[in-house]
């Protein structure tokens, strides 16, 4: 059993994505088939061990992100990106809806050269297909080899939608986003 778990872990890949409030992005990816874990956190800033309060101040340079551990044999990175781009607005600079500030920017922190290339190709394809009414402003960052550290957010920010589905922000912002995801990507839902 332990050997099988080690082999399974070695086959997993990691994606780090910023699509606005991490509670929203976390809630979506927790429902995706082939995703093994989703952790809310921060990336892309200059402060070590940032806190939610510091990041929300807008001066640390960090984006709210999620670290998604997934099995590429079940869901390829390209489909992770498809879900990511379909469940937030990648055309708004430093904001998602009423959440405004650099911490809410759209960002892909590519964990390998292959992810970096795939993110660029995905953006070019979406742009060429005129999927969005405005240009995509998603930041694509080469974070391979630990160049850009991921900092896990405080415990109260983990599993937020699962733990607080009736909370106002969850009911009015996250729930509709999750419903849109579930409708569009029904074939990708966990059983």
From Swiss-Prot:
GO terms for biological process: protein modification process. Keywords: Oxidoreductase. It holds the Pfam family PMSR. It catalyses: L-methionyl-[protein] + [thioredoxin]-disulfide + H2O = L-methionyl-(S)-S-oxide-[protein] + [thioredoxin]-dithiol; [thioredoxin]-disulfide + L-methionine + H2O = L-methionine (S)-S-oxide + [thioredoxin]-dithiol. The keyword Oxidoreductase applies. One of its GO terms (molecular function) is L-methionine:thioredoxin-disulfide S-oxidoreductase activity. It comes from the Bacteria. InterPro entries: Met_Sox_Rdtase_MsrA_dom, Met_Sox_Rdtase_MsrA_sf. Its EC number is 1.8.4.11. Coiled coil: none annotated. The active site is at 21. It is an enzyme of class 1 (oxidoreductase). Belongs to the MsrA Met sulfoxide reductase family. Has an important function as a repair enzyme for proteins that have been inactivated by oxidation. Catalyzes the reversible oxidation-reduction of methionine sulfoxide in proteins to methionine. This is Peptide methionine sulfoxide reductase MsrA.
